[in-house]
Amino acid sequence: MRKRRLWWFVVLFRVTLVGAILPNETFDVRRYYADRFLIEDEENGSSRSYYISAESKAKAAEQFALLAPNCSLTSDIQENTCNETSSFCDHRVDSTYKTYHYEQEKCNCFIETCDEETNSTELMVLYPDCYCGKREKHCDLSKEKCHWTPDSDHDDLKFEVFESSNKVLFDYMLQAGSEKANLKMNKVSMVSKFFRQSGFNCSLRFMHHFTHQSSTSRLVVRSILQSGEKKNLYEHWLKPASVFWVPVQVAIGSYAEPFKISIDCETGFPPKKKKNKPFTCSIADIYFENCGEIRDPIEQCSRGDQFLCSISANTRCLQNAQCDSRIDCDDESDEMDCGNINGTMCDFNGQDYCNSWYQVTNVTDYHERLSEPTTVAPLNKLNEVPLHLFRLQSPSAKIKEAMRGSGNMLVFDHKPNPLTRRTSALVSPELPRTNPEAYDEKSPLFKSCKLRFYLCSRTYSKVWQISVISKGINPMESGRTIIYEAGYTLIPKENCTWERVFVNIPRQNAGFRIGIFVTNYFPGSEEYVAIDNLSFSPTCFERDINQSTWDIPDLFINTCGASGFEQPQNCDHNRELDGQTGHFLKEDGTQQWTVPVTGFYRMEICGAGGGSNSKASGDTGDCVTLQVHLIENLSLRMLIGQMGESPCFTEHDDELRPSSCSKISHNYVYDGKRGAAGGGATLLTVEKDLWNVVAGGGAGASWDGFDMEVGYGASAIHVKPDQRCNETCKAVSHTDFIVERRDNRCPGEKGESTVFGGFGGGGNSCGMLGGSGAGYQAGNPFGKSRARSGSSNVSIDFSKSPIYYQSERLDEGYIKIAFCRKRCEPPTVCRFRKDYFEEEYCGCPDGSNVTDTEEACAFPLVCPSSSTNQYRNFTYEPFCLCNNGKEIYDVYNDTCEEIQIWTLYNITFLIFAALTIIGALFVVYHYRNREKQMKQEILDLTQMKSPDYLYDDIYFGRTTRKAALDSLPSISRDSIERGRVLGRGNFGEVYYGEYSGVKLAVKMISRTFSASQASQSDFCNEALCMGTFVDENVVRLIGIDFEKVPYMIALEYMEGGDLLSFVKECRPNQVSLNPFQLAMSDLIKICCDVAAGCKCLETFGYVHRDIAARNILLTTRGPQRVAKIADFGMAKEITYGTEYYRINGRTMMPIKWTPPEAFIDGVFTTKSDIWSFGVLCWEVFSLGVVPYPNRRNEEVMLMLTEGARLEYPYGIPTRVYQLMRDCWKTAAADRPKFVDVVEIFQDIQDDPASVGMPFPIHPAVRATFAHSQSTPVSVETPMTAMTEISLNSTFTDASTVKVSAQQDMQDRIQLHELMLTREHPYTSELTSYVVNSIRKDLARVQYENGLTSVPQPEYLSPENNDESVQLIPQSNTVTDQTPPTSLIDLNRLGVQNTGPTLHRPDSLNFNDPYSSVPLLECQTR
């Protein structure tokens, strides 16, 4: 009799070790089979056989008793005997367990269980989807054939059967709910019958439509054992984003004891008041699936993405659930032994995102904000700090939690709304290489390495992405592979639905990182992204992985399928094959590779061959094989040469030979006598301006005859062309290895028939001669044999003893890189033998063989005591590194010279210290004797001022102050939509606002200052000034509100911030020498705007008194910026005569922006603003350097009084500095008016010689920028500090300054003469009194600060009248930062703020070179 066998379990005690990881190593397979029946049905359904594994027949009888009716024990139990034909014989049991057999005469899915106490029976189902005959898969709710029973604890809440209007999904449905009943913590359920057992793949499927009456409403699926123990299998509690039916699949698993399933709809608490939310719960299409298949769980749950729960009572096969921060097994075995590799699990509940992950942000460009700013910045100082776009957030009404109790999540939702477009990246720590088994098609772990996370998003496309980042690469630079990119997920409602995302991780043969990138493309939009519970599959990494693995794959870098002149376009396929080892394609066609591990590497580098014609083949390229020592994270840039093009002789040759036939000339039918183009060279470099390795390209094939219409290939060194190379030859020759197709085309009509050289500088051909090959020295196209091909070269400081040879194949160029993998015990290192560098061996660092002596592999040099033993990178040559940075290779003839130098330094220091102590004692003694006399002689300037005020009120438009205020536009503060605070101080605060769509900066005086009459006067004065001066270069007044306290002024909002902060941020930084890409014309335009605003003030007869870069605001930081004058708190109208007025009383003023007549006589005129404007121009062109660096205010006053002026900033146009000197004339009458200044600047803007000058970047800064890119060499510390630049080279005498190629020497001479020109000293009745008082005050301040040993500069001596004395002491001492405006009380001449302590920097600070080095072109003597 043929039998149809249904196997629910197959193997009793076989554990299959698959790959590197088991589904669950703690699973008890014997216990699993002792609790479950194996069932076999006859093919015709007439009988059914049961098998059980037990220790004895009696134990088996206890199990089979559940199957016998009427509670009677059966004696018809037999021990099963295996034969070869029985499929059960393939699966043996151990000696303690045997298999027993019991047979029933018919198929039966129902079991009558008895209760001995009540002597009653209850119907139980064998397993959930058991059937005999025709299968009733779906529960027809209209009939009584279902294994389900409704239950409810409320009379108005019961399930009723309804016929579905949509027959496509289902025919009938169950629905329970009530609109009027007061439902509070009630429940309506559908409960199944008890089932004897189930398979481990058993699941329940149904559809539900659930309407919440409150946030506590939920739908729960539970399993209930006979003992009453309950377990939640599924929970639905989130409010739906749509009104559609939700299909559900609930994993039940394999139960070994009777159980039943309950679908519970819980109402929760009633809804809040005034909210009518009826509760409804609808269920349809209920059925079980795969519940009888009790197969061998280990064999059936053995894939890499599966996990078998270890409890035999309820065994489940989980999919993508192991190590995902969520407990799915009752014994928590799915989350055991997880997180061994740092950073592979992240639930975002920590304080720093997750374990070792970090966030970086890159500002990409500037743009105008589209909504209210949330970045707090003062109105007059835009100190912008990059804000990260990702942040941690707890669940909210907008974004619910991904799972119950999951906690914080990673969110991007534009809340920071930064002023600039930026990109943030959440970057993982360095991860080891991926498990090779996960990428082997024959392995059960194939395609199991995934990145898993929960996602809730509402975004446009490409707003965020997940990428693989190669080891050692800056996350914001190129060299990353996108593995997941956001699509268009903008949904109509605010709430989004969480979904689980699985992303395949490409194979990684070396260490790598994962980065989650987001860019705020659309500021102010309603986009948001939420990510939670991010984890890697445990099969991604080997269990015993060594994170510093030596298993580095060989790397083969080719042209990525490109040929001829076309640059490589796509190398993704190659990157996938080599396992993402840090190799990627750059925009210019070069390729970059990052060294994964420090050690020796073998490189085989070959140039490309030349093109061929119908007569001959082109020459092959050159090859170089070498050995080089590379350090980890070093970037190598490579250009792979491509074959030169071959001429097309028919219209279809390009189809037959697409890789080398000239594509541009296929419409031109040649006469057959044409030359081919030369091959490109293959190059490698670790420096920007030097090719360390050049493998020459082969020459293109030539035809018989001679012509001169042929070109040279590119050359790394200068090549003198052959005398036969005419102008045409020179025109079609290459000067660079990276050339574009349109360059060096053949002249005239033959331009369309150019046969182009291969990428990498191959020479073009225009006639019968073939183009020469590119190389270290390009080949001569007029030469013979190999002289026409390019030569090869390896720089001596990159590799020693390279092997040069000619390639045997006419092919594209390539580079092969192999790592020396042999593990060697220190001090030996893995190296390659010098015969073709193929054999690996463990040798001494210098390449010699290891001996058994004590001196084996000893350092070959005896270094001085003040030096350390080092090995040079690349060549691995030994040398001694002195403490002063000097490198010694010949220890017998060279020394560090450090001991002698330091001895001299110590002696000098001791002498200086002794003199300092003696001088200090003398000054203290002298000061004590004259202290009383000095205090009596200090001049009180208030006694020298006229006691009469020159004005009692300020008149605007010849009206009273009140009338002028009444004429200003008024605005109600209640109509302003208030935003964030932009700035706050003692006077009050400034906040952002919007009024009728107009952006405002609202300034409010505090209540304390509102009570002061003087403060009210100043506040009104500022409003009157801005309301009177209506000009495009003056900040516009929108309105005022003086009706109630605190007073309010509404001004136009200036997004660009203050001018001083802007020019400081224009300085070179570590990323760019010109961050804002400014030109000289931009700086001139800013100064012209300020002059135009001052012209408006001059027209009205007002003096601003505080013209400085800090008081100038910019409309934007982009190219359309306009500078406007602000802060009129010190502005006064001239009411005495028509030209000036005199101040009296305690007056504070910015000394470094003030002319001599102001701080000596207290006289301010419009010419005073002219002086201040000249200092402002100096600030702009010096990029925010404080005027008169390192000078106290007292020193500045003495300098200006004696006729000294500021030096010119580096790179300033001569005409601009001439105008600045005109503004600083001693006599106010000699200074120009602002009308004249505006005309001069307009003329300068039309002068190409001025506006065409480069952006002023000091050579010291350029040198520092270049040195910052270098890689110092050290075996022990490979990443040392940047090479120090001597400050003495920065400050040179004018006669030694190198002449710039962009500026005429005559202009430089004129600039220097202007700078050396000394103005007439300022003299008045008060000059001598003020100067003497300043000298005394300066001496007193020095004594109080303990500076008694500081010698007095010569120019401070009252007896010194020699104008040749240096007014600006020659010193490299500079301030660490630009000090705030220093103010001097003219009545007491006491220094209020002298700035930070002076110090001498040890090296050039590249982070802010303008604050550490005064960028003056030369020093004055």
UniProtKB/Swiss-Prot annotation:
It comes from the Eukaryota. Residues 1-20 form the signal peptide. Residues 21-903 are extracellular. It catalyses: L-tyrosyl-[protein] + ATP = O-phospho-L-tyrosyl-[protein] + ADP + H(+). One of its GO terms (molecular function) is transmembrane receptor protein tyrosine kinase activity. It is a single-pass type I membrane protein. Its EC number is 2.7.10.1. Probable tyrosine-protein kinase receptor which regulates the dauer/non-dauer developmental decision probably by controlling daf-3 transcriptional activity in parallel or together with the TGF-beta pathway. Regulates integration of conflicting sensory cues in AIA interneurons. May act as a receptor for hen-1. In AWA neurons, together with hen-1, plays a role in regulating olfactory adaptation by controlling the forgetting sensory responses to odorants such as diacetyl. This is ALK tyrosine kinase receptor homolog scd-2. The lineage of its organism: Eukaryota, Metazoa, Ecdysozoa, Nematoda, Chromadorea. The gene is scd-2.
